[in-house]
Structures are given as C-alpha cells and as structure tokens.
C-alpha cells in the first residue's frame, strides 16, 4: 500500500465498538464503554473522573452465560470514586440492576433503578443531561450500542 493511502486508512479507522464510543443524541454527548471485570471497571471509573464536566452515568450489568453468572467481582470495583460533585446521577440497569443498586448503597451513593436500558437512556436524555456515560458489561454491549445508534 502506498503511503498516501495508508495515511487515509489510518484517518478513517474507527476502533471503537463500545470502547469509549461516542454518540451525539439531541443535546447529549454519550460515551459507551465496556467494563467486564474489576480492572476494566476501575479503568472506566478513572476515565469518567478525568472528565471534569458534570455528567450522568448509567451502569448496565447482566449475568448471561457469556458474562459469567458470578457477579461477585462488583465488590472489587472502587465505585466510591463516583461520590463526586461532577456526577449528577447514577442509574443502574440490566438483568442484575438490583445487585448493582445494592453495591452502590454500600458506598453510600444513591442510584436510580431502571431495569430497561432503553428507558434508562431515554430518561437521562429527557432530564437534560449534557454528558452521559454508559458503562456496560459484555452481553449488554451490543444491545446498548444498537439502542444508541438508533437514537443517534
């Protein structure tokens, strides 16, 4: 491949697909990111907290076979870092939203439970959030991405 074509390929390359993937829906900038274990989730938390703007969060946790049905790893994640003035709201969603809400309660962080992911996203956008982070585990990634792409 000639160098001029290679530069164009690099410019057009989009490695996202759920890795800090960005959507713009109405007046809301949405970032979708995969978090499937404690190390990955803690990296997500660091990325979210580096953004000093006000933001809302949706955390989607499933326990399908591909995710692994043992979600005890959630207790190894440093969710207490979300106790910051820049976090306007946290919504928990997905099959294991009750467990995620309990986990947030243990670090004294209030969260709203909306089991249906699409409803959760629509509600946050309707509430006027300007910046929305959607953190999902593996089996929630593709369906959530489709929801966001269809709203985009």
Where do the language-model regions lie?
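Gly/charged, well-structured mid-domain segments that form the phosphate/adenylate-handling core
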Residues: 1-31, 35
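Short loop/turn motifs at secondary-structure junctions
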Residues: 2, 53-54, 86, 128-130
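Residues at or immediately preceding the N-termini of alpha-helices
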Residues: 3, 38, 117-118
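Active-site beta-alpha connecting loops in nucleotide-dependent enzymes
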Residues: 16, 28, 34-113, 151
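Generic C-terminus detector
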Residues: 98-106, 110-152
